[in-house]
A protein has these predicted regions:
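Short flanking/linker segments adjacent to small metal-binding domains or redox-active Cys/His motifs
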Residues: 141-162
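Residues that form generic nucleotide/phosphate-binding pockets
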Residues: 26, 54, 94, 155, ...
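Soluble extracytoplasmic domains of inner/organellar membrane proteins
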Residues: 81-146
C-alpha cells in the first residue's frame, strides 16, 4: 500500500482483489514454480494495468510497480499450512510510495486462492507443495502438533498455580 492510512489500506485490498481475480484462472493451471514465475512475468503489464485501473476507478492517482524480488515475510498461515518467517521469492505489486502494510501470498502453489472462510488447503495444492519442498520443509509447514509457548508466561502461570 502507498501508506498505512485507512484510505490507502482500503484501496490496497481492492487492488489485491482485482489482481487475484485477474490472475487466478491463469495461475491455477500452473504445474511448477518456474511456470508460475513465467506466467507472472508474461502477465506483469496486464497485472500492473489491472492495479492502475482499480486505483483510478477509486479516485487514486498513484503509480504501480510490479517486479520479482527476495522479500522477508512474517509467519503466514493458509488453513492447515503454516509457513515460517523468512525470505521468499515474491512478485511485488507496489502502490505509490509502497510504505504501508502489505498483503502477500505464496507463489506456488498459488495459495492466495485458498478458501478464506473454511481455511482449507486443497489436497492437490498440498501435493504440489510437497513436490517443491524437501520432506523436512513440508513437515514443518504442515505439522499442526507444534505448540508455541512463551517462557515468561509459562513461568507466571506456574508461579500463580494456573
Amino acid at each position: 500500500a502507498n501508506s498505512d492510512s485507512q484510505e490507502d489500506q482500503e484501496v490496497k485490498l481492492k487492488v489485491k482483489e482485482a489482481v487475484v481475480d485477474y490472475i487466478r484462472p491463469v495461475l491455477s493451471e500452473s504445474d511448477s514454480l518456474s511456470e508460475s514465475r513465467a506466467i507472472l512475468e508474461s502477465e506483469s503489464d496486464n497485472i500492473r494495468n489491472v492495479a492502475i485501473k482499480t486505483l483510478r476507478d477509486n479516485g487514486f492517482m498513484e503509480d504501480v510497480s510490479v517486479y520479482f524480488e527476495k522479500s522477508y515475510f512474517p509467519v503466514k498461515s493458509y488453513g492447515d499450512v503454516t509457513f515460517p518467517a523468512g525470505y521468499y521469492e515474491a512478485f511485488r505489486v507496489d502502490i505509490g510510495e509502497a510504505e504501508g502494510k502489505n498483503w502477500w501470498c505464496v507463489l506456488y502453489p498459488p495459495l492466495c486462492f485458498v478458501d478464506a472462510v473454511y481455511g482449507v488447503v486443497p489436497e492437490d495444492s498440498k501435493e504440489k507443495l510437497a513436490g517443491v519442498l524437501t520432506d523436512e520443509e513440508y513437515k514443518t509447514v504442515t505439522d499442526r502438533g507444534c505448540k508455541v509457548r512463551f517462557k515468561y508466561l509459562t513461568f507466571i502461570n506456574e508461579l500463580l498455580g494456573l
